[in-house]
């Protein structure tokens, strides 16, 4: 697939600067590429071929090996959204993130939240067996990406003690609980729902049962 500049994704690596900007893990970089310098790393060639690329950015097909080749303190922001759950080498990835992040940079990490997944199984999918399995500590499964290896927010600090959690938000606390699909298409409903989601995103009782958690991490001050 060609980007807007007509450069094949695999050949862009030598042509883009990573002296500043954003590192995005996965294929969601297009959203952030407008007005930013973005480098994206995705191990799946198939996913890269299907990605949106109407904004120019550097797409690398690779995984942890690609991160190892990048210079220290290359990025102001690192985005890792719903990725670590599927990675076998999470601790190594986090150490690379720490190395690649500038001293005042931030790591934006979105992760599955086990209690929220249990809510989804019971309330939305009526699947009590999977809910019981999750409550017993078993992993989940995604048809697109495979096994979901759940982890706790605090595990990030255990795996890489140089990070600290600056902020924690709940994502999709209410949205999917509304099963009237016609509502989802209504812009007025969407606006009110987003306002409600934002209002409770940092309130612990609601955050605890959100489908996802959004962690903002930074380097500990030395």
Q: Where would I find each of the regions flagged by the language model?
A:
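Conserved alpha-helix/loop element of class I SAM-dependent methyltransferases that forms part
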Residues: 1-15
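A short glycine-rich, Lys/Arg-flanked "PGG" loop and its adjoining helix->strand segment in the class I
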Residues: 91-106
């Amino acid at each position: 697939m060609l980007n807007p500049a007509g450069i094949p994704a695999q050949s862009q690596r030598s042509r883009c600067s990573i002296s500043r900007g954003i590192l995005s893990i996965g294929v969601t970089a297009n959203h952030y590429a407008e007005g930013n310098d973005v480098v994206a790393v995705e191990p799946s060639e198939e996913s890269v071929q299907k990605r949106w690329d109407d904004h120019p950015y550097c797409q690398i097909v690779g995984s942890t090996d690609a991160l190892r080749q990048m210079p220290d303190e290359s990025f102001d922001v690192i985005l890792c959204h719903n990725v670590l759950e599927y990675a076998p080498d999470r601790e190594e990835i986090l150490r690379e993130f720490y190395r690649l992040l500038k001293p005042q940079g931030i790591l934006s990490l979105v992760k599955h939240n086990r209690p929220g997944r249990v809510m989804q199984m019971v309330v939305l999918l009526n699947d009590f067996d999977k809910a019981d399995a999750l409550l017993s500590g078993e992993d989940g499964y995604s048809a697109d990406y495979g096994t979901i290896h759940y982890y706790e927010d605090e595990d990030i600090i255990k795996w890489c003690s140089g990070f600290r959690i600056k902020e924690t938000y709940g994502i999709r606390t209410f949205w999917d609980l509304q099963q009237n699909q016609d509502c989802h298409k209504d812009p007025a409903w969407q606006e009110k729902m987003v306002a409600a989601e934002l209002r409770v995103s940092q309130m612990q009782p609601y955050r605890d049962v959100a489908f996802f958690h959004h962690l903002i991490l930074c380097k500990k001050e030395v």
